[in-house]
């Protein structure tokens, strides 16, 4: 055990006898039979079964401390004396780790002094002998060690330690002896139980020094650490930190703070200097003011300060003879000065002029005045400006401007947008006269041949660039009863041609019809033979009767308004013996019937449909049979259903259901109890697609509930002075809590939304 160094083993032989009486009692506590031998403050244990080395160590750690750790010859002799002999011998707590024999309990390498190998051991047969056994009561090598493969099964030799974790105040190492222990204190601690900490003592803090200390073990004691710093404008001279060592001595002496020093200054030539030094000469916070003699001016700052970085706030100024700023010839121009020494001193004068294509901006002559300023700013030569021109419509302009936008030597290139043609010069230049070499060109749109609306149709055009010009788009539609023959849309392309030929509107045709047998046909055609608008009149020969419509018309759907009639002899007119019951249009639906002989007679066929929001239940067509019965039951139209709304305990719901509960057209309104607010939409409607227009809302509590008001009321009622206030609040709460009873009752599905109440979700469905 790492925290329990062992003491002398010589006096422990006797104590084994005292501990032997405990073996029988302990064996009943362990599921696997275990025998123990005690020696003073350690107990040795061994298993009665054989295990591999890993399982043996697991056995020891589960029941005791670990496999035994042997560190001297006396311990080996004692174990060989008290532990019984078994032919498989015992595993001990040594194993080869990283090719070194190691005590597994402490993870320390086996020292040469502690080795107790048998002769010619360890030999590492087959390169897998990484664990160690002890020969207990061996005739040839009693108590000696041997390396063995770890998978072999041997008895586990264990020990139990009795050290206490808090011994020696956790500031030293406990050395156990028989029935007692001593403490070996760690550096910096002393005393029988290592209870005292070595002190270094306090020290004086020099002036201006800032100190911050930490004392983990006591003021100015072992492990105390102090850090030092200086205020702004001071440098630390000495160590920045000190530590109290285990010997009770500080690692260094305290440092000192010295004012930051700047470089010494002198008055400039032809000038004076006046300085103030609050701390030391030319040190932090010193300041110096400079002035120049008459006829000279100062170049630089007239006041300098010594900063905390040890640098002056500005460079040392100089005094120079009054002169004007040096001048240079203007770009694209020239300059002549007098005198020509180049000093630009007082009363110097300079004249300026510009090269061709440039004009002088400013005075052509300036003088250096007595204050060192020129009488006017130096002029500049600017390129002549050509007049700005408007960018032609549908044109792109790209200019190169070496001397500025639209100035001398500027060149502008023109190009036209797609669908436009350039008329004029493609490039114009700004000349030295300030005029353009050419007039700006124009872009004229490409035009296509104008189109006309087709006969019996219409044409709608979008012409962003002008009538029938490029990018014009024309859409064509035909009047009712006509269809488009050709493209529905034409575009004017950049080449000036339409993308196709103009379409035509042709009349919709109906199937050709003929005169009935024993009859005649007379037709008139407005838009062509048997086309939309054509009408035909039928008649029968004498002695024959017309059955069907006498007049039919070709409709826009391409069908005749009625089937062609027939002619039957008068004496042989059929008298139908049976008829089917007359049908009626279903509610919210449509019905269209075709009667073969007479209304609802044999072979009459009726077709059914429903309005928006309703679906057909049943067959969509019925035919009257020869027996006078329809082929199916008359269908009905049922409203589309939405999902059922489930009411929250707090939400009140009021619904109107014109076509059934939660069906198409149902509208539900929501409101919350007094004191709560609605979170969401206050109304939702069932749509034709079977979905609600809005999600169902919820109720959330307001800022003050009745219970909270009662809580606040309790404090007022608790005192005599609060009785009046409490009585008023109780009256208000009673009024608020009084259940409203205006003779209102739960609503049924047909209740109007304005009716007060709560929808009871009664079972209402008008369908059979």
Curated annotation (Swiss-Prot):
Q: Which domain of life is it from?
A: Eukaryota
Where do the EGF-like domain residues begin and end?
A: 159-195
A Gene Ontology biological process noted in the UniProt record is:
positive regulation of phosphatidylinositol 3-kinase/protein kinase B signal transduction
Locations listed in the record: Cell membrane
Signal peptide (residue range): 1-41
Q: Which residues bind a carbohydrate?
A: 123, 133, 146
Lipid-modified residues, S-stearoyl cysteine kind: 745
What upregulates it?
By exposure to bacterial lipopolysaccharide (LPS).
Residues that hold Ca(2+) according to the record: 121, 123-124, 146-147
Residue numbers covered by motif Endocytosis signal = 756-759
Q: In which tissues is it expressed?
A: Not detected in the absence of exposure to lipopolysaccharide (LPS). Detected only after exposure to lipopolysaccharide (LPS) in the tissues examined: spleen, lung, brain, liver, heart, kidney, thymus and small intestine.
Q: Which residues cross the membrane?
A: 710-733
Q: Which GO terms describe its cellular component?
A: external side of plasma membrane; extracellular space; membrane; plasma membrane; platelet alpha granule membrane
> Quick one: where's region Interaction with SNX17?
759-768
Which cysteine pairs are covalently linked by disulfides here?
60-158, 131-150, 168-183, 185-194, 200-244, 230-257, 262-306, 292-319, 324-368, 354-381, 386-430, 416-443, 448-492, 478-505, 510-554, 540-567, 580-624, 610-637, 642-686, 672-699
List the ranges whose topology is Cytoplasmic: 734-768
The record's listing under Pfam families reads:
Lectin_C, Sushi
Q: Family, per the entry?
A: Belongs to the selectin/LECAM family.
PANTHER family from the xrefs?
COMPLEMENT COMPONENT-RELATED SUSHI DOMAIN-CONTAINING, E-SELECTIN
Quaternary structure and interacting proteins, as annotated: Interacts with SNX17. Interacts with SELPLG/PSGL1 and PODXL2 and mediates neutrophil adhesion and leukocyte rolling. This interaction requires the sialyl-Lewis X epitope of SELPLG and PODXL2, and specific tyrosine sulfation on SELPLG. Interacts (via C-type lectin domain) with alpha-IIb/beta3 integrin ITGA2B:ITGB3 and alpha-V/beta-3 integrin ITGAV:ITGB3. Interacts with alpha5/beta1 integrin ITGA5:ITGB1 and alpha4/beta1 integrin ITGA4:ITGB.
- The protein in question is named P-selectin
**Upper lineage:** Eukaryota, Metazoa, Chordata, Craniata, Vertebrata
């Amino acid at each position: 055990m790492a925290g329990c160094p062992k003491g002398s083993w010589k006096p422990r032989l006797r104590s084994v006898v005292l501990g032997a009486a405990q073996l029988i009692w302990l064996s009943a506590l362990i599921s696997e039979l275990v025998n123990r031998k005690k020696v003073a403050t350690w107990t040795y244990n061994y298993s009665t079964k054989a295990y591999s080395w890993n399982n043996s160590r697991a056995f020891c750690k589960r029941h005791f401390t670990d496999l035994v750790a042997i560190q001297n010859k006396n311990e080996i002799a004692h174990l060989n004396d008290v532990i019984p002999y078994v032919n498989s011998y015992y595993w001990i707590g040594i194993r080869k780790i990283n090719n070194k024999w190691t005590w597994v309990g402490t993870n320390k390498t086996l020292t040469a002094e502690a080795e107790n190998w048998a002769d010619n051991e360890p030999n590492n047969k087959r390169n897998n002998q990484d664990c160690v056994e002890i020969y207990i009561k061996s005739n040839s090598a009693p108590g000696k060690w041997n390396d063995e493969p770890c998978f072999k099964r041997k008895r586990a030799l264990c020990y139990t330690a009795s050290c206490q974790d808090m011994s020696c105040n956790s500031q030293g190492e406990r050395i156990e002896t028989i029935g007692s222990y001593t403490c070996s204190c760690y550096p910096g601690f002393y005393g029988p139980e290592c209870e005292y900490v070595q002190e270094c003592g306090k020290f004086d803090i020099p002036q201006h020094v800032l100190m911050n200390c930490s004392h983990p073990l006591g003021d100015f004691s072992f492990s105390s650490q102090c850090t030092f710093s200086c205020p702004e404008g001071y440098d630390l001279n000495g160590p920045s930190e000190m530590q109290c060592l285990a010997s009770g001595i500080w690692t260094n002496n305290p440092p000192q703070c010295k004012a930051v020093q700047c470089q010494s200054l002198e008055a400039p030539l032809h000038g004076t200097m006046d300085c103030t030094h609050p701390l030391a000469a030319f040190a932090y916070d010193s300041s110096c003011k400079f002035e120049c003699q008459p006829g000279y001016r100062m170049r630089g700052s007239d006041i300098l300060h010594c900063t905390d970085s040890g640098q002056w706030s500005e460079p040392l100024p100089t005094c120079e003879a009054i002169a004007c700023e040096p001048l240079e010839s203007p770009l694209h121009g020239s300059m002549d000065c007098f005198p020509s020494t180049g000093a630009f001193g007082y009363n110097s004068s300079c004249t300026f002029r510009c090269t061709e294509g440039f004009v002088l901006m400013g005075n052509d002559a300036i003088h250096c005045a007595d204050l060192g300023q020129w009488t006017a700013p130096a002029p500049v030569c600017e390129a002549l400006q050509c007049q700005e021109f408007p960018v032609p419509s549908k044109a792109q302009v790209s200019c190169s401007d070496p001397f500025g936008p639209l100035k001398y030597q500027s060149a502008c290139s023109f190009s036209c947008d797609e669908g436009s043609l350039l008329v004029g010069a493609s490039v114009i230049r700004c000349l030295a006269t300030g005029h353009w070499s050419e007039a700006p060109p124009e872009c004229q749109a490409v035009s296509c041949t104008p189109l006309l609306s087709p006969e019996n149709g219409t044409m709608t055009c979008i012409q962003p660039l002008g009538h029938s010009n490029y990018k014009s788009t024309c859409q064509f539609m035909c009047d009712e009863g006509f269809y488009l023959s050709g493209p529905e849309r034409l575009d004017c392309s950049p080449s000036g041609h339409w993308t196709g030929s103009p379409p035509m509107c042709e009349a919709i045709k109906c199937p050709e019809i003929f005169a009935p047998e024993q009859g005649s046909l007379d037709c008139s055609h407005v838009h062509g033979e048997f086309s939309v608008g054509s009408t035909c009149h039928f008649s029968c020969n004498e002695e024959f009767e017309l059955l069907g419509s006498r007049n039919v018309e070709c409709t826009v759907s391409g069908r005749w308004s009625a089937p062609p009639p027939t002619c039957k002899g008068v004496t042989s007119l059929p008298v139908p013996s049976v008829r089917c019951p007359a049908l009626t249009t279903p509610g919210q639906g449509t019905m269209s019937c075709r009667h073969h002989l007479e209304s609802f007679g044999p072979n009459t066929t009726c077709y059914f449909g429903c309005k928006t929001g309703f679906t057909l239940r049943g067959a969509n067509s019925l035919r009257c049979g020869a027996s006078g019965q329809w082929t199916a039951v008359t269908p009905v139209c049922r409203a589309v259903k939405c999902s059922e709304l489930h009411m929250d305990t707090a939400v009140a719901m009021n619904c109107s259901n014109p076509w059934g509960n939660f069906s198409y057209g149902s509208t539900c309104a929501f409101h919350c109890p007094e004191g709560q607010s609605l979170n969401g939409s206050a109304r939702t409607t069932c749509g034709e697609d079977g979905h609600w227009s809005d999600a169902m809302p919820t109720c959330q509590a307001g800022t003050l509930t009745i219970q909270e008001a009662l809580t606040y009321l309790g404090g007022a009622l608790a005192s005599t002075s609060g009785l009046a206030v409490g009585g008023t609040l109780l009256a208000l709460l009673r009024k608020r809590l009084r259940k409203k009873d205006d003779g209102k009752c739960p609503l049924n599905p047909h209740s109007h939304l304005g009716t007060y109440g709560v929808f009871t979700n009664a079972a209402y469905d008008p369908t059979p």
